[in-house]
Curated annotation (Swiss-Prot):
Annotated SUPFAM superfamilies: NadA-like (SSF142754)
Annotated [4Fe-4S] cluster binding sites: C110, C230, C320
Listed pathway(s): Cofactor biosynthesis; NAD(+) biosynthesis; quinolinate from iminoaspartate: step 1/1
Keyword Iron-sulfur: yes
Species this chain originates from: Bacillus cereus (strain ZK / E33L)
Protein name as catalogued: Quinolinate synthase
Top-level taxonomic group: Bacteria
Catalytic reactions of this protein: iminosuccinate + dihydroxyacetone phosphate = quinolinate + phosphate + 2 H2O + H(+)
Length: 368
């Protein structure tokens, strides 16, 4: 038995024959199955997916758009989600019991989502309650596990995306005096600062030391940030910005708010994946842009806008490795197992977790 087989069950591993198929043959089979299944099959794809996968998506979008699509689609029996695990979980929780959600590769996870597990979160909430009493409301970025969404749901909180973070943080402060923001400290910090909350009124909870890190007066803390981050956006630096300013002084810099505060502050624009796409789309021909977000998306934007000069803010960036787990062979494999009635990699969230998580999701969806 190989090391991989010990880590991943053999039945969820891609069969050998898919490695030897030509791209043309795989694409032909995907088209055949899509045509055969019609509206009973729905393939949502995240913007960070590879082109070889996105070309077959029935809907492409960011986390908010895909959550809305999942919630509104009642016709498809099979939803083959081309994204990462937490997105497929969200789709399962927002669809009916008769609909089946499949993730083509179960290894497509999210390191940020894994930075906040439920045991750590329950322990943190208990300790923070000792400090602040019943003055807190939890918000979680949708880039989190179903269990964390459920935690927020049963504690009066909600989910957020990078598209609606300002709206949801503003709402949270109408409910409680303080906010606990999971699991991405950078999105939480950038959003709160953008709403006028000074940095010295923000603290960071370290789940590994069970300690609160802060510089100002503890009584004045308004935002408690979970010490988590996106492994992709963490790699954009102020030095990258300085290099662009030096070598291309007329180039606009636009970044995702999962980048650290210093990078966002030094950029010209910051916003969600959809915001970045729309901004470049509406920019005049001949304009110049350095984009600080995932590389698959940056490359796609470059291809779609040959009339504009577009580069990655960090020229040495790699695509999101876990997003890249979903590829054409895994997509075809998932579709062929459906065709045979032998579905693999079915995502099924526990009923109680779903009920509580949907509370958090609906508090978001009804406000956007």
């Amino acid at each position: 038995m190989s090391i991989l087989e010990k880590v991943q069950p053999i039945e969820t591993m891609l069969p050998e024959r898919y490695y030897t198929m030509s791209t043309e043959d795989m694409e032909k089979r995907v088209r055949e199955i899509k045509e055969k299944m019609g509206e009973t099959l729905f393939i949502p794809g995240h913007h960070y997916q590879k082109d070889e996968v996105v070309q077959f998506s029935d809907a492409a979008g960011d986390s908010l758009q895909l959550a809305q699509v999942a919630a509104s689609n009642k016709d498809a029996k099979y939803i083959v989600f081309c994204g990462v695990h937490f997105m497929a979980e969200t789709a399962d929780m927002l669809t009916t019991d008769d609909q089946i959600v499949i993730l083509p590769d179960m290894r497509a996870g999210c390191s940020m989502a894994d930075m906040a597990d439920i045991e750590q979160t329950e322990r943190a909430w208990k300790e923070l309650t000792k400090l602040f009493g019943d003055t807190m409301i939890p918000l979680t970025y949708v880039n989190s596990t179903a269990a964390i969404k459920a935690f927020c749901g049963r504690n009066g909180g909600a989910t957020v995306t990078s598209s609606n973070a300002k709206q949801m943080v503003s709402w949270a402060f109408t409910q409680k005096e303080r906010l606990v923001f999971l699991p991405d400290q950078h999105l939480g910090r950038n959003t709160a600062y953008d709403l006028g909350i000074p940095l010295d009124k923000m603290a960071v909870w370290d789940p590994h030391t069970d300690s609160l890190e802060y510089d100002g007066d503890i009584e004045e803390i308004q935002v408690i940030l979970w010490k988590g981050h996106c492994s992709v956006h963490q790699n954009f630096t102020v030095k990258n910005i300085e290099n662009v300013r030096k070598n291309h002084p007329d180039m606009n810099i636009i970044v995702h708010p999962e980048c650290c505060y210093e990078v966002v502050a030094a950029s010209d624009y910051a916003g969600s994946t959809k915001y970045i796409i729309d901004m470049i789309e509406s920019a005049p021909s001949g304009s110049k842009w350095a984009i600080g977000t995932e590389m698959n998306l940056v490359n796609r934007i470059i291809q779609q806008h040959p009339d504009k000069e577009i580069v990655s803010l960090n020229p040495f960036m790699c695509p999101c490795l876990t997003m890249n787990r979903i590829d054409l062979p895994h997509l075809l494999w998932a579709l062929e197992t459906i065709e045979r009635g032998e579905e693999i990699n079915v995502i099924s969230v526990d009923k109680q977790v779903t009920e509580e998580a949907v509370l958090a999701l609906n508090r978001m969806l009804e406000r956007v």
